[in-house]
């Protein structure tokens, strides 16, 4: 499994045992964490079979080309296996399929990218299903016989390069559990962080960026629809609400750059994130 992370040690500590359900070994890209992530991963290499902990050269504020970083992460893992899972720190795989069944499927379907349902948890057994979140599939598992190239992207890069063929796995067989929506204040800060990051990258570097309206569509002004889900969340649903948001690097980045670039309110959904700087 490969994972890029920054200042998410509180998640990684909980995720490592869960990730082992489907992954035998791990390669991490530590994007300039200041919360001890890199040190913790190094200290627990033997316990979790972490084969490499790479580090980004950039300052970590999304000013580097993300696809280049993901390529380096992928290449390190490809030295060890052609069967690769790529998950963010707030994601894990779950379902009825066993590790052995998944491995057999990958071995029998070389050079195939598997799209899995992206399940948006909002509580222990409640998931978000409004708009694009009702039927959403993501690229998190693939097999490779030769080294592929990522499509170039400054930000929001594909997680895995396309090997030429693809397939779809459906829940409850296998799915991606996504924790992003568990805590609404955390959601607002994360999405507003991307708005500010895009603003800075476009103003400073001329990058093509995602328009703010795309984040508004994702947040949907917090007017969400829910359904019950058969698989209980394997993480404490309050994990985000227990963190100090104002001490997060995303919140600090927002405040610093609003002042530095005189950024207008990009619509913070009335959550007073933009506020007084």
Summary of predicted features, one role per range:
Residues 1-3, 19, 25-29, 176:
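Hydrophobic targeting segments
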Residues 2, 38-86:
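Active-site-proximal specificity loops/subdomain of glycosyltransferases
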Residues 7-22:
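Short, well-formed alpha-helical segments that are part of the catalytic scaffolds
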Residues 9, 35-36:
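Acidic phosphotransfer microenvironment of two-component signaling modules
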Residues 63-74, 82, 92-277:
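Catalytic-site signature of metal-activated, phosphate-bearing donor transferases
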Residues 14-18, 40, 100-101:
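A short acidic, amphipathic alpha-helical/loop segment
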Residues 24-35, 53-56, 89:
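Short beta-strand/loop segment that forms part of the nucleotide-sugar
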């Amino acid at each position: 499994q490969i994972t890029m992370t920054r200042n998410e040690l509180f998640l990684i500590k909980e995720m490592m045992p869960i990730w082992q359900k489907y992954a035998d070994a791990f390669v991490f890209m530590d994007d300039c964490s200041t919360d001890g992530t890199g040190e913790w991963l190094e200290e627990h290499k033997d316990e979790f079979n972490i084969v490499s902990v790479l580090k980004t050269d950039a300052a970590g504020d999304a000013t580097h080309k993300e696809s280049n970083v993901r390529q380096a992460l992928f290449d390190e893992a490809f030295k060890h296996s052609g069967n690769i899972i790529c998950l963010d720190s707030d994601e894990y795989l779950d379902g009825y399929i066993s590790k052995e069944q998944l491995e057999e499927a990958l071995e029998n379907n070389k050079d195939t990218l598997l799209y899995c349902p992206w399940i948006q948890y909002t509580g222990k057994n409640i998931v978000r299903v409004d708009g694009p979140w009702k039927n959403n599939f993501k690229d998190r598992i693939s097999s490779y016989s030769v080294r592929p190239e990522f499509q170039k992207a400054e930000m929001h890069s594909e997680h895995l390069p396309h090997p030429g063929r693809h397939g779809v796995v459906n829940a409850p067989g296998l799915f991606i559990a996504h924790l992003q929506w568990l805590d609404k204040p955390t959601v607002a800060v994360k999405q507003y962080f991307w708005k500010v990051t895009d603003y800075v990258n476009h103003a400073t570097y001329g990058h093509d960026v995602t328009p703010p309206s795309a984040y508004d569509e994702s947040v949907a002004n917090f007017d969400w629809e829910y359904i019950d889900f058969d698989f209980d969340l394997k993480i404490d649903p309050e994990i985000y609400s227990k963190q100090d948001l104002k001490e997060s690097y995303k919140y600090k980045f927002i405040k610093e750059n609003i002042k530095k670039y005189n950024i207008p309110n990009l619509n913070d959904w009335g959550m007073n994130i933009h506020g007084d700087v």
